[in-house]
A protein has these predicted regions:
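Gram-positive cell-envelope targeting signals
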Residues: 1-34, 223-224
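Solvent-exposed, well-ordered loop and adjacent helix/strand elements within mature globular domains
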Residues: 27-224
Length: 224
């Protein structure tokens, strides 16, 4: 009787899994665009932010392929499909404001929360949480128990491998984006980003009217 119950339980589990909507990503599921990562070298914070605390000042930055997320009903899958774009050059995923997609532990909020991570090299990385590291795999909802990574970039490994290079074992960026200059450094500050644009933010544009003469420069600058 006990054996029969075990068999029935296995059948029930298998049947349940069979109804979970899993789906392999296709090109029609995501948007493709261009992200200029060079602007991160002199990145200016656009939004107001407040201290989120550094849960671990680690430098390791691993990665995962976004196509590993296949549960269509999950917050991760839905958020990626609705809000993220794949950079056809670097393979990084980014949102409408240029925040890079990454997996973070529960210490750093929920899916869709955004952060500024400042590195020891002075670099500011705008990060949006698009996947959640399992609490079973991280210490204190923070760093991965095995590799110590706080930030795990969510990427398209095909494009990223071509752009950042691969090691002999096939790992993108030799398995650690800390090997890439723009991402090199340990975390010295983490800030939670709000939706409010900072009053000190100045956006520079390149499409200035070249036909403005000296007499009208004052009126142009005044908005008349």
């Amino acid at each position: 009787m006990k054996r029969l119950k075990q068999i029935l339980m296995v059948i029930l589990i298998v049947a349940t899994i069979g109804f979970i909507p899993l789906k392999a990503w296709s090109e029609c599921d995501v948007a493709y665009g261009e992200l200029d990562i060079d602007h991160f070298f002199d990145y200016t914070k656009k939004f107001e932010s407040y201290d989120a605390g550094v849960c671990a000042p680690n430098s390791t930055k691993t990665y995962m392929d976004y196509r590993a997320v296949t549960l269509e009903t999950s917050r991760q899958y839905i958020y990626m499909r609705n809000h993220m774009t794949v950079d056809g050059t670097t393979g990084l995923l980014y949102d409408k404001d240029g925040f890079i997609g990454a997996a973070l532990g529960s210490y750093y909020g929920s899916i869709g929360d955004r952060f500024y991570f400042t590195l020891s090299n002075g670099q500011v990385l705008p990060i949006v949480k698009i996947d959640a590291k399992s609490d079973a795999h991280v210490s204190g909802g923070c760093a991965h128990a095995n590799d110590g990574s706080v930030i795990e970039f969510v990427i398209d490994t095909d494009y990223a491998g071509e752009y950042f290079g691969r090691s002999s074992n096939g790992y993108v960026a030799w398995g650690n984006f800390n090997n890439i200059d723009i991402f090199n450094g340990y975390i010295v500050r983490a800030e939670y980003v709000t939706d409010t644009i900072s009053s000190s933010y100045v956006e520079y544009v390149d499409d200035v009217d070249e036909n403005i003469d000296n007499e009208n420069i004052f009126n142009y600058a005044s908005g008349y």
